[in-house]
Amino acid sequence: MEKTRRKGLCTVFLGFFVLASVAAACAQQLSPKLQDAVGHWQVIDNDKPNGHVDTYLVGGMLFGRVTEVRPGRTPKDVCDKCSGDLKNQLILGMVIMRNFKPDGDIWAGGTVVDPENGKEYKGKIWTLGKDKLSMRGYIGISLLGRTQTWVRIP
């Protein structure tokens, strides 16, 4: 009798755990607008092509890695102006966007590093349809920054 009771309690706890896990996974589903930010992008800076960045998800957060350096750079160039763990790291392959979290229909709360000057900025990211992405980097408040529009690479 006692063994059956324990088995029943274990089944109830296991069922609760599975249900809670499924509920948590469903809660982390991203809207299509947020999902559109994941992909392969041509960076456009001052109306000129400026390298490629792949954006991807890790733990529900958006990150971005340089997959092609800007014109005039070589794949062996490093970020000599960066600080911390990015100091003297190859620009090609560098994770320049980190820890962007969903905030309504945008990604916010993350940081972006400009490998040209080594500076780190707060950032916001939103999509303009499926094939354009806007990245706003700023210091302090969003008004003190600038926005780049990136174009999806098929």
Residue positions per predicted region:
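Central antiparallel beta-sheet cores of small beta-barrel/beta-sandwich binding domains
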Residues: V38, V43-D45, P49-E116, E120-Y121
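Bacterial N-terminal signal peptides that target proteins for export
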Residues: E2-F13
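Short aromatic-glycine motifs in intrinsically disordered, low-complexity regions
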Residues: K81-K87, S134-I141
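Acidic, glycine-rich flexible loop segments
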Residues: V112-D131, R136
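Bacterial N-terminal signal peptides
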Residues: T11-S21
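Generic beta-strand structural signal
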Residues: L57, P102, T127-L128, R152
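Edge beta-strand at a domain terminus
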Residues: K130-K132, I139-P154
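N-terminal helix-cap/turn-to-beta initiation motif at the start of protein domains
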Residues: Q28-H40
